[in-house]
Structure formats: structure tokens, C-alpha cells
């Protein structure tokens, strides 16, 4: 089955690669319109997936990732329309020159070809990835988790219907609908047809792809995100950022998981933090150094375990620990972070610049929430993933990250001397 899907995707990629921007945008607008027109069908499929998830004991955090509502679906359709307004990178000349040997040489952006994406309980990924791949002239093979197979099937059917209406191959967007895990292993070996693989899920999925795939893999999306509260902060402003970073959408990979507080302000700041987090329904997981300042406060407090520093909560839970200074904060992030998104809250320009230089994450913030690590917030449109590696892309992966380049040489019946 996958062999045929791969062949069909590769054939479709050749057709997509030569489409004009107008043709691609027409397809995307048709997809957005049909997503809204067929929303009842998609939401009904999602409701069945969600019912199974509850019955199987899925955590509330993962249920939130799985859930589609009319509002969320409308926002996704709006994101697709936003992709139309983005500049098409395909065909752009990156650089060029006239060489001494008479060759006019240029480097031009081209599609990758076929992209494979493996993801878990995230039905929005189906549409986000499909829209970005289509805009950049790439075909895509999607493998969502078993938790979302009804939602994904309904969504891909709508996308393929839109493609057919626009005279484009339905095989440009395909989904592996079977929940059989063996098909994941087969996809990882489909390097004859698939040019890049992107896993979006937990650490286990990323490890499997890194170790087993014969296709180049882009890993990331696991976000153990930190905020360091320096001793120079404005308490009220800092608490607002911390609250938003934690509770705006706790299940997101860019939500705050560990708060590092300069020990010089612990006696004044942590009681205020307790009030803020209590109002937001956040449970604090305190280190031994932070516990005395939080015990007896209004927020629920438990002792942090060392393993908590290395994992995503994806829920209304927050690790809190004290650090002596900026050096200690950076050291903690280096030891426990995932190079996703980390922030400093400070009024010291010197400390801000040091933090930016020394924290080696894909996105680093000064006096801003980690929640900004998002393709839409970065002006990239819907993202295909957030890469925490350094090759071939880093951070939110927008359109350019779904292209490569080719060298093109022009001559006048030119031969090499």
C-alpha cells in the first residue's frame, strides 16, 4: 500500500512543482471554503475520536490537542487563507553571479518534493501541513495517530475534493488511515519517494524516527520551556507574562514548564506568584529552595521531582526553583532544556544580551512569553513543525523551510576550458 502511495505522491510532486502561485492559491482558497462548508462532517468525525479518547483514559491535555470546535476549525480555515497571502518562495533567486569562466550562475528555490509527516493527537496538523506543502509545491503523506484517524480521514477527503475541483492530483495530499503501527516502520524506509520526514509527537516517536528512518528527519516540537525571572523585574509585569505563558494553552509545546527565579527576590516574589497561580488553577512543583516561600500560600504546592525538569507537563503544572544568578539559570536550561523556547524577564540590558547569546535554543525571548514560538505569530503562516535541531531548519518551519535550492547555469554554447 505505501509503495503505491509513495509512487503517486512522487508523480504528484512533479505536477505541483511547476504550478504557478495563482494556481496554488486557488487550490488553497478552495480548501478553506470546503473546510467550512463541510465542517459538520469533520466535527462529527472528531466527536467520535474524542469519545474514544475519553473512554480509553486519554489525559485532558491530549484531549485538548485532539479537540476540534467550530471556532478552531474556522481559525484553521483562516490560517489556510493567510498562507495564500504569503510570498511564494518557489522560483526565488537566492543569489547569482557572472563567473570569470563565462557562466551565469544562480541559486533558485525549488520544492523539496515529497514530505512525510507523522503526528499524534493533533488534527490541526493535517490542514496546516497540507496547506504549507501545497503552497511550496510539495506533495505530502500524512500519518496521524490512531486517536485521530476519523478526523484525519474526513479532513483529507475534503482536501482531496478541493484539489480535484481545481484540476490537481488528489495524491498531492494522502493520509495513511490504518492505525497499524507497522505502517509507520514502512514509511520510515520509503526514501525512494519521500524526501523529508517530520515527526510531531512525543520523545518516543522522535527517537524511533531518528534511529530507524532512512529518510532525512527534522526533529523538534518537544518543549521543556523556561522563563528566568531576574532580580530586576517589575513584579506585576513579570507575573502577567508568566501566567500567560503557562495557562493560555498548557497543552502547547511552547507553554512554560519551569520557572527559574533569582534567589534575591524569592521572599517577595514567590508569595505573589502563589496568588497569581492559585487564581489560574496552577499546581506548583517547588524545589527545596523555593518550597519555604510557597508553603502556606494560596496555590497548591508539591515537591518537585528531578525527572519533572526533563519532561513537558502540558497541563496546569509548573516547576519552580531558585537560582543564584544568570549563570545558574543558563546552566539549568542547558541541562534540562530541549532547545525549543526560553525567555528572560529582566530590566538589565547586559543580562538580556548575555541570555540571548548563551542560551542555545531555537527561539530566545527577552521580556516576552515563550508562547510566541509559532508560525502564525512569526508571520510565517501555519507552521509545519518547530525544529529544535540546526539542520536543515530551526524554529517554526514556514514556507522557506519546505524548499531547497538548485544551481542553474546559463551559457552561450559554453564549454569548460
Swiss-Prot record:
Which GO terms of type biological process are on file? L-proline biosynthetic process
Q: Which UniProt keywords apply?
A: Amino-acid biosynthesis, Cytoplasm, NADP, Oxidoreductase, Proline biosynthesis
Extract one GO molecular function annotation from the record.
glutamate-5-semialdehyde dehydrogenase activity
InterPro entries cross-referenced by the UniProt entry: Ald_DH/histidinol_DH, Ald_DH_C, Ald_DH_N, Aldehyde_DH_dom, G-glutamylP_reductase_CS, Glu-5-SA_DH, GPR_dom
Keyword Cell division among record annotations: no
Q: Which GO terms describe its cellular component?
A: cytoplasm
Q: Where in the cell is it found?
A: Cytoplasm
Query: What EC number(s) does the entry state?
Result: 1.2.1.41
Its recorded reaction(s) are: L-glutamate 5-semialdehyde + phosphate + NADP(+) = L-glutamyl 5-phosphate + NADPH + H(+)
Q: Which family does it belong to?
A: Belongs to the gamma-glutamyl phosphate reductase family.
Summarize the protein's role. Catalyzes the NADPH-dependent reduction of L-glutamate 5-phosphate into L-glutamate 5-semialdehyde and phosphate. The product spontaneously undergoes cyclization to form 1-pyrroline-5-carboxylate.
Protein name per UniProt? Gamma-glutamyl phosphate reductase
Organism from which the protein derives: Pectobacterium carotovorum subsp. carotovorum (strain PC1)
Give the organism's phylogenetic lineage.
Bacteria, Pseudomonadati, Pseudomonadota, Gammaproteobacteria, Enterobacterales
The UniProt gene name for this protein comes to proA
